């Protein structure tokens, strides 16, 4: 971002207008089948909140499933993404890549997502706010803060390897 500026998707014309009041149901299952057949690159589908949809996407050949409520800014009544994450993970093959991004505010939120089955956790607003406030140094500080928060929370959880986190780490083992 700092080196090349804001990304500009090449498949959108700069004058393209989107009417947010019109239905956008053009990307149905048949469209995705055709897209997968035509597209040889990686296919990541974002906005998945239903385990049945995730399973269908896996069967259609999606390379990754991106669990996201889009910051919960577009549809307040959608299922809570972090509550759906473990359900989606359990419906998929272990080899299917699962990405998560909603509601990440600190290192503990990252750990919750990893324990719930995410392979990758994205941090959007935090990174943008950090860059806006302090430029590159803000991004470095944000990254260092998240790392420290993760280390502290893992110690509290009794977890020693971030690659071995699982749902059991979210439950207290003390009686």
Locations of the language-model features?
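Conserved, mostly hydrophobic/aromatic
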Residues: 35, 57, 65, 113, ...
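Short, acidic/turn-prone active-site loops that include or flank metal/cofactor-
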Residues: 70-73, 126-128
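Conserved functional loop/turn residues at catalytic and ligand-binding sites
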Residues: 61, 69, 117
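Structural preference for beta-strand elements that scaffold enzyme active sites
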Residues: 42-44, 63-66, 97-99, 120-122
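Alpha/beta catalytic cores of nucleotide-metabolism and tRNA/nucleoside-modifying enzymes
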Residues: 83-175
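Residue-level recognition of oxygen-bearing side chains
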Residues: 53, 80, 109
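Active-site entrance/lid segments in N-terminal catalytic domains of soluble metabolic enzymes
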Residues: 1-55, 59, 71-74, 83, ...
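Second-shell residues forming the walls of enzyme active-site clefts
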Residues: 64, 77-85
